[in-house]
Amino acid sequence: MSQPLRFALNRMVAPRLSLPAFIELAVTLKADAIEIRNDLAGVEIEDGTPPQQVRQLCAAHGIQVLSINALYPFDVWNDERRAQALKLAAYARDCGARGLVMCPLNDRADARSEASRGAGLRTALTELAPILREHGILGFIEPLGFEECSLRRKRTAVEAIRATGGLDVFRLVHDTFHHHLAGEQEFFPELTGLVHISGVEDREAPLASIRDGHRVLVGEGDILGNAAQIEALLERGYSGHLSFEPFADSVHGLADIQRAIGASIDHLKQALA
């Protein structure tokens, strides 16, 4: 490994901590960036924390805000989505975030054809691009590998970005969990703005049955191939952050989350040495 790994903490890794405690956790772990979310009750940003407060707390500790997670479902464009996008883009700008994560519709009841889904994606990107430009932030598109998702693969997103002239404001989120679930083989390091990492250790569960609740910290028992995915991205030129995003309650309930994340960091450093 020719370059040091750059780690970040997604708010999902420790959703029960206060914002100051979460920032302190990042500092202690020598992670110089965080991601905040709009889907966690009781913490920022759902608790009404002003964006300026987030900016000030992070700046005081040398922490960068990578993103807000997430605009959903970004690829179903309507007046409600526009209002959500404007609100989140303003918050991202004001808190100093680099960008806004955008997740596609994940609904088994979505009866749209592939052509209709593709048209919806291109419409959304066309509408979102000027909003992102106006607010000076990036849009991080995160395909979800679940079978029912309207945008499963990064190749589809890349083609839509290029077709709509959005290369200046759109980047991909390479999520190691969703990359594995989608059975993807392609990597797009030149368009990857952020990497989400989490592990799965349940070897018995059928692939199609694996959900967010299976996602733990990356360790020896990981079946997603996190180290191999990260190595492939780094070898192809990716130099951005690796952001921990485990959803499992077993992680959220850990008595010593700092030690657990530290062990995962050490594991990845050793695996990628």
Which residue stretches match the model-derived regions?
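Histidine-acidic metal/acid-base catalytic patches
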Residues: 1-8, 16-32, 59-62, 90, ...
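Active-site beta-loop-alpha junctions enriched in small/polar residues
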Residues: 10-14, 37-41, 70-73, 105-107, ...
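Residue-level recognition of alpha-helix initiation/capping sites
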Residues: 16-17, 48-49, 83, 123, ...
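Active-site acidic/histidine proton-transfer and metal-coordination neighborhood
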Residues: 20-24, 57-60, 76-172, 256
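Glycine-rich, proline-tolerant flexible connector loops at the mouths of alpha/beta enzymes
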Residues: 35-58, 106-112
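Short beta-strand segments at enzyme active-site cores
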Residues: 35-36, 65-68, 98-105, 139-142, ...
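Alpha-helical scaffolding within the catalytic cores
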Residues: 49-54, 87-88, 228-229
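The substrate-binding groove and active-site-proximal loops of carbohydrate-active enzymes
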Residues: 71-79, 216-219
